[in-house]
A protein has these predicted regions:
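Bacterial N-terminal signal peptides
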Residues: 1-15
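Primarily the internal scaffold of c-type cytochrome electron-transfer domains
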Residues: 62-66, 125, 129-150, 255-257, ...
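Disordered, acidic Ser/Thr/Pro-rich linker "stalks" and the adjacent N-terminal cap
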Residues: 422-470, 489-494, 515-575, 672-710
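Solvent-exposed helix-loop boundary motif
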Residues: 21-117, 121, 125-167, 183-188, ...
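A short beta-strand element within beta-rich, extracytoplasmic domains
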Residues: 480-504, 508-516, 576-586, 597, ...
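Primarily short, surface-exposed interaction patches in extracytoplasmic proteins
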Residues: 155-188, 192, 196-227, 242-291, ...
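Extended surface/linker regions that mediate inter-domain or inter-protein docking
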Residues: 214-360, 366-367, 371, 487-489, ...
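A conserved hydrophobic secondary-structure block that centers on an alpha-helix together
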Residues: 323-348, 554-593, 604, 762, ...
Length: 1010
């Protein structure tokens, strides 16, 4: 054992045949720095066995006190100013027989030994900033096993939450505030659960209902409202730092980010159990495979900013690109671990966490979980029936490519041949006749291998160059040609069955050129295709621009065809020579996998979906004269046409911007072939990789394994699935404490733990630890219903307290009691009253729209771009919020449907502390600033809604006093008192009803919840 030997050797000179003397010729700096010179040696050679994860002989070289003292023996191992007698030097230089450290790997070099020796002789200075911390994970509250605590017995407390809260109040000699009045309660509850003010009718009904169950019915009604999902999805969007642009210097719009928002709204409205909610957002493609519409949940992993210039625009093999990937994965893992475990795992990126038991190895184990995904548009079928049908049809199409014995028998059978006869006799036969090239050959200028197949097509294989041009040459017996047909055929040897060679099956045809017996290119007047990828239409293959092209994504795995009609019939020379060049210049391997060329002399217009030459030849024969192979060819064609039509009839797959390993490449961003190797980086430096990371999670959760056991060759999604299971394991105490604290925070404006996303030593401790554990354990063990958790919280007397203390409190002893409470618990951590809080930006905007009668409750779909948009000088567009038509349809929906622009946020919403999505925001700032006052008084949105409210008041009431009374009821939920009615009416008469409405929107009662 290392420490025993150290103890023995103290003060005793030891010699060994393996010992290395000091090489005085080595040049060293005048002063040796621990951080710059010594610590990197320890991290590279020693920390694996003597660090936070493993401490052989209880010795550590990352904690100063242990490094100096010598571990278990407590005998000094590093003697400052005396390297000769320091046992550490004896071991690393081989001065102990049979004991040369490190025991694994290369011995330290003479240079490294000289550095350590000089550092010790200088006094072994070790700054506090570089000193590790010994953390006993079992002692820290958030890592302790989650066990349901006993509910304390409290007189008058009929609810578990009240029992826990009042026990704490009793300890400090405090009393709870009296209940809030019913108007305050319904307004508080309505904004909390659905983010909208109650209507006067709803208030009247609740206030007048004498039934003690009236409050419970109100809670149930609000939780059942579709508005609930909209309100609570917005909270989660803050936490996930969701926005609809990339951010950074190239703030490109994400056209398909919004399905994730709609997923959240649906998940909250459906009360998705929390374990499933977590699993869907981390690994829906594996753990919710029976519900393909849940693929949109993977938008969570891609919700944050993305550096386009680094991850798309620069070369794959650069250091900057590799750094960008590590940073991108850092955002993904931070999003997951901060929001589901409330730990700052990202602080272990460059070194072991300084305060929490999270070693750097755990951080990179989580990096390895996301090593196989990128952020991109991911296609999916939301309908499981459509998905299964698409899969079955693709499988059938693949089988038809090379029919086996059983399929041959089926196709030559009576039923199949009857279908052929019916098809042949039908009037739906295609009219254009196409003839394949004879004696055709194909060459690739880029290095692809093009193999001729019996059907006249060429199958590409072998090398897949970035760019390529296929030169297909042949002869034709036609004398005049009106157009050319390019078929791009599916094949099981191609990615996703093709028809392209890109990993996702796509292709990009940049230009097509046809020459007939000379070098003169035949002009093409018109092009048509059976399918065009958005923004990659077939006309782009004849526009003369190499940067544009025809594509077919997401309809991959299908044959496609394009028709190119000549400007006028072209004469074929006597030798019949035809040359077609298929230029594929977009890059990233967007190459055609199996092309086939045919010609027609029919009169224009020519149309896609016409008969192949071999089928035309067979149809010219009498059925009785056809051979078995010809009958099979015809049956295969008819069945393939049926399958192709069925596939084309299916809805186009939807797209969501999400984590994916299969997507349409952009620039240098391509689907990864598999999970990339992840190495621990010494000090977080990409140039200093050390050991290979194994996918896993956190070792500090004792009940669960820290590394995942995965078979070799599994898809990257298996890693995410294991992480999702780790997160939702009942033995993981972090997940359940985190979510109940998060929900509590949004009801009380602060969590039981103030730092919602930091349950570590730099975060705050819980104000009511037993209550937190009771809520978490009960939530975990009772179905994990978030709606049930809401119900439990808002039905407590603690939630229903008044936010301010009136004269009636404690039998008129208001002064002494409240002064004592403010003195003992100034910031109300013990909840002796309810918190008063300002409405968030969305609630302010939505409340104005609801009050004015302009709110549109249409749900879902693409986000509302409440700005004027023009192209910018570079990627980021020019945004002008002032030019937006506030009365247009895009200006009336709830704020959760606003388009969120990262670098160019809405100034009005920003003034009210609405986050821009650039950072994870578990808790918003709740400020009161001059900017807010100016925004609420001058912004065009406020002015417009004040005008609309005035119009509503004029329509619904006839006198100024009645209009003022209704306005106050709509805005703050109560009748004005006599003085208010007189003053407001005079103001409305003097300055106009719109100005009075404007004032009303600026009152504290409108802006705050009591």
């Amino acid at each position: 054992m290392l420490t025993i030997l150290i103890f023995v050797t103290i003060g005793t000179p030891i010699t060994s045949s393996t010992a290395r003397a000091c090489d005085e010729s080595i040049e060293l700096p005048k002063t040796t720095s621990f951080v710059e010179d010594v610590q990197p040696i320890f991290e590279a050679a020693c920390i694996a066995c003597h660090g936070p994860l493993r401490q052989e002989s209880e010795y550590r070289l990352d904690v100063r006190e242990v490094a100096l003292s010598g571990g278990a023996s407590s005998a000094p191992n590093i003697i400052p100013h005396n390297a000769v007698d320091s046992p550490l030097m004896h071991f690393v230089s081989g001065q102990v027989d049979g004991m040369l450290m490190p025991s694994k790997g290369k011995p330290l070099s003479d240079q490294q030994l000289a550095v350590i020796r000089k550092w010790i002789d200088q006094g072994a200075p070790w700054p506090d900033s570089a000193n590790g911390v010994i953390v006993d994970k079992g002692e820290w509250w958030s890592l302790k096993p989650l066990i349901l605590p006993h509910v304390p017995e409290q007189t008058g407390a009929h609810h578990p939450i009240d029992a826990f809260v009042r026990a704490k109040l009793d300890e400090q000699g405090l009393l709870p505030a009296p209940p809030a009045d019913r108007i305050t309660l319904i307004r508080r509850l309505s904004f909390d659960l659905i983010g909208l003010p109650p209507t006067p009718e709803e208030i009247d009904t609740f206030v007048a209902d004498p039934d003690t169950a009236a409050y419970q019915r109100l809670v149930d009604r609000l939780l059942a409202s579709p508005r609930y999902g909209e309100r609570w999805a917005r909270h989660w969007m803050d936490a996930a730092h969701f926005a609809e642009t990339h951010g950074h210097d190239q703030d490109r719009i994400r056209e398909n980010a919004w399905p994730y928002r709609d997923y959240l709204i649906e998940a909250f409205n459906d009360d998705t159990p929390f374990n499933r909610f977590v699993r869907e957002q981390v690994a829906a493609d594996v753990l919710a495979a029976d519900s393909p519409n849940k693929i949109a949940a993977l938008g969570f992993l891609a919700a944050g900013p993305w550096d386009e210039s680094t991850l798309r625009d620069i070369r794959e093999d650069t250091i900057d690109r590799e750094i960008g990937r590590y940073v991108d994965r850092d955002d993904m893992l931070t999003n997951v671990m901060s929001n589901f475990t409330s730990l700052t795992v990202h602080c272990a990126r460059c070194h072991d966490h300084k305060f929490d038991p999270i070693p750097q190895a755990d951080y990179y184990a989580l990096q390895a979980v996301f090593a196989g995904v990128e952020r991109a548009n991911r296609s999916y079928d939301p309908d499981v029936t459509v998905l299964k049908l698409r899969e079955a049809l693709r499988k059938r199409a693949e089988q038809l490519t090379a029919p086996d014995t059983q399929l041959r028998q089926e196709l030559l059978g009576t039923k199949s041949q009857q279908l052929v006869a019916e098809w042949e006799a039908s009037s739906e036969r295609h009219l254009t006749v196409w003839q394949s090239l004879e004696n055709a050959t194909a060459e690739s200028t880029g290095g692809s291998t093009l193999t001729a197949l019996p059907d006249g097509s060429f199958l590409a294989s072998g090398a897949r160059p970035e760019l390529d041009t296929y030169v297909i040459a042949g002869r034709s017996k036609l004398t005049s040609v009106t157009g050319i047909r390019l078929e791009v055929l599916a094949d099981p040897s191609l990615p996703n069955s093709g028809p392209g060679r890109q990993n996702n099956g796509n292709l990009h045809l940049s230009e097509i050129e046809v020459t007939l017996g000379s070098d003169k290119i035949v002009p093409i007047a018109r092009a048509a295709a059976d399918f065009d990828q958005a923004e990659w239409e077939i006309v782009r293959a004849i526009d003369g621009k190499p940067e544009t092209a025809w594509g077919i994504y997401p309809k991959v795995g299908l044959p496609h065809e394009a028709i190119f009609e000549f400007a006028e019939p072209a004469q074929i020379p006597t030798d019949g020579k035809v040359i077609v060049r298929l230029k594929q210049l977009h890059g990233t391997g967007h190459l055609i996998g199996r092309p086939r060329i045919s010609l027609s002399s029919d009169k224009p217009p020519l149309a896609p979906d016409n008969l192949p030459t071999e089928v035309t030849a067979i149809l010219a024969m009498e059925p009785a004269a056809r051979s078995e192979e010809q009958r099979l060819t015809l049956a295969v064609y008819v069945e393939r046409e049926r399958v192709t039509r069925a596939l084309r009839a299916l809805p186009t797959p939807k797209l969501v911007y999400a984590a994916t390993a299969d997507f349409e490449p952009e620039g240098s961003l391509k689907p990864p072939p598999g999970p990339r190797p992840i190495h621990l980086l010494a000090r977080g430096d990409i140039r200093s990789p050390t050991e290979l990371a194994v996918p896993g999670a956190l070792a500090c959760v004792d009940a669960l394994p820290a590394r995942f056991e995965l078979e070799a060759g599994l898809q990257e999604s298996a890693r995410r699935a294991e992480l999702a299971k780790w997160l939702t394991d009942a033995r993981n105490p972090l997940t359940w404490r985190s979510i109940v604290n998060r929900i509590w925070h949004h009801h009380f404006s602060r969590g039981i733990v103030d730092t919602v996303n930091d349950f570590g030593r730099l975060g705050s401790k819980p104000s009511h630890p037993e209550l937190l554990d009771w809520l978490a354990a009960d939530f975990r063990d009772s179905g994990q219903s978030i709606k049930a958790l809401h119900r439990k919280i808002v039905t407590s007397e603690t939630y229903r307290q008044a936010s301010h203390v009136g004269e009636c409190w404690c039998d008129g002893q208001r002064g002494a009691r409240s002064d004592h409470a403010h003195r003992v618990d100034t910031d109300n951590r013990l909840l002796w009253r309810m918190h008063r809080t300002r409405l968030d930006a969305e609630c302010v905007r939505d409340a104005m729209l609801a009050t004015s009668g302009q709110l549109d409750l249409h749900m879902g779909g693409m986000s509302d771009r409440q700005f004027d948009l023009k192209p910018g000088r570079h990627v980021t567009p020019i945004i002008d919020y002032a030019m937006f038509d506030l009365d247009g349809p895009a200006g009336q929906r709830r704020s959760v449907y606003r388009f969120l622009f990262r670098t160019l946020p809405d100034p009005f919403m920003e003034a009210l502390d609405c986050p821009a999505g650039d950072q994870i925001t578990p808790a918003r700032t709740n400020s009161v600033t001059v900017q807010q006052v100016l925004a609420m008084w001058n912004d065009s949105l406020v002015l417009k809604q004040a005008e609309h409210l005035a119009v509503r008041l004029r329509l619904e009431r006839n006198t100024t006093r009645d209009r003022v009374s209704l306005a106050v009821r709509l805005a703050v939920g109560r009748e004005p008192n006599a003085a208010e009615l007189d003053g407001f009416s005079k103001y409305a008469d003097d300055y106009g009803l719109p100005n009075f409405c404007r004032v009303l929107f600026n009152t504290n009662e409108f802006m705050f919840i009591d």
